[in-house]
Amino acid sequence: MMRKLAAVTAAVTVLCMPVLRVSADVPEVSAKAFVLLDAQSGQVVCGDHAEEKRPMASTTKIMTVLLTLESGELDRPFTVDSEAIRTEGSSMGLQEGDTVTKRALCAGMLLPSGNDAANAAAVAVAGEQSAFLDMMNRRAAELGMTHTCFASPSGLDAEGHGASAHDMALLARAALRNDDFAEICKKQQMRVCFGNPPYLRTLTNTNKLLAMDDTVIGVKTGFTDAAGRCLVSAAERDGRRLICVTLSDRNDWADHEALYDYGFASAQPYPMPLPELPAVPVEGEDADSVQVYLKAPPVLTAWRGVPPAYEMTVLLPPFLTAPVRKGEPVGTLLVTNGRTVIAELPLCANVEIIQNDQEPIPQNMILRIIHAFFNVFFNYR
C-alpha cells in the first residue's frame, strides 16, 4: 500500500523559501525582536531577531487561555484554589472562596491580564501548576515553537521562561482559530460573573490597539521589568490577516500600527504556476484514462521583498473505476507552506466514462486513504 500511494502521488514544484530580513521599506521599530506574519500561510513578511528567545511577560497567557478553553466545561462554576490566586502583579480581583468559571478566568487573563486568573486556570485544568506547564510545553512543541520554554502560566519572570517573537506569532495564529479565544480577545470590555456570591463585574482590556485601530482583532499585552513591554496583536484588512509580535518595545502601539500599514500595503496577488496534471487510468476491459483539471487556479498572497514559499502536491488514486462523470472531483491539489496546509483544491475529470462490467471501487474511499497517508506529514491545525 505504501508503494502504491507513493507511486500515485506526485510532489511537485517546491518554490523559493522565504528569507527573514528587514528591507529598506520596513519601518524602524524600537523592539529588540519583532515579526510580522501572514496568518493564512504562516509566511514571515518581515522581522528582526525573530528567532531569538526572550522573556515575553503576560503574552504567555495566550497559551494558558488556549489550553483552558480546550479543556471543556467552560461554564461550570467552581471555587478557585486559594493558594493559586496568591500572586503578585496584575489581577482580575479573585478572592479566597470566590466562585468562577473557566470562561470568566479566560476573560480575566486576556483583558486585565490577571495573574491570579492564570494560576487558578492552571490548577483547574491540570490539578497543579507543574502539570499544566508540561501541557504548555507539549503544545508548544506541537505548534513548532522551537525557541520556547514555559516556566510560568502567567508570564511572571521565571528561570528559563521565554519564547521567540516568531514562536509567539505561531501561538497567536493557532489561538485565533479557536472561536472562543477570538471572541474574547477582541473585546475592549466584558461583563463577567464571579465572586462569593458571584456578581457581574466589568473587565477592561489592557490592549489599547483595539481602540486605536478598528481593524485590530486582539491579542495580548505583557510587561515585566525583565521582559519590557511585549505585545502580540492581529489585524484584518481586505480579507487578509496579519499577526505582529514585538518583544521589549517601548513604543509598541505605534510600531504595530506602522508595521501593519507596511505589511498590508506590500501584499499582492500571487497567481501560482500549476504543475503538470497527469492522466489517471480507468480500470476495466477497455482500458482508458481520464485527464484531470483544476476548475479555478489558486490565487495566493505574496509579500513585497519576500519570495513565495508555497508548495503544491498532486494527490490522485492509482486508478479510477467507471462510471466517471465529467467534472467529478477525483483528486486533490494540496497547497502547503512547510507543514501548514493552505488550500485543498479539487481535481476534476475532464471526460465522461461509462460504467463497465466490474464492480466499482468508490473513488472517495481511495482518496480518503491517500489523505490519511498525507495527514502524517502535514499540520492541519
Q: Which residue stretches match the model-derived regions?
A:
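Sec-dependent N-terminal signal peptides of Gram-positive bacterial secreted proteins and lipoproteins
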Residues: 2-23
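Domain-terminus/edge residues, biased toward the C-terminal soluble/receptor-binding domains
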Residues: 145-146, 157-381
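Generic detector of short alpha-helix boundary/capping microenvironments
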Residues: 6, 29-30, 52-53, 85, ...
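Active-site-adjacent loops and short helices of periplasmic peptidoglycan-processing enzymes
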Residues: 19-179
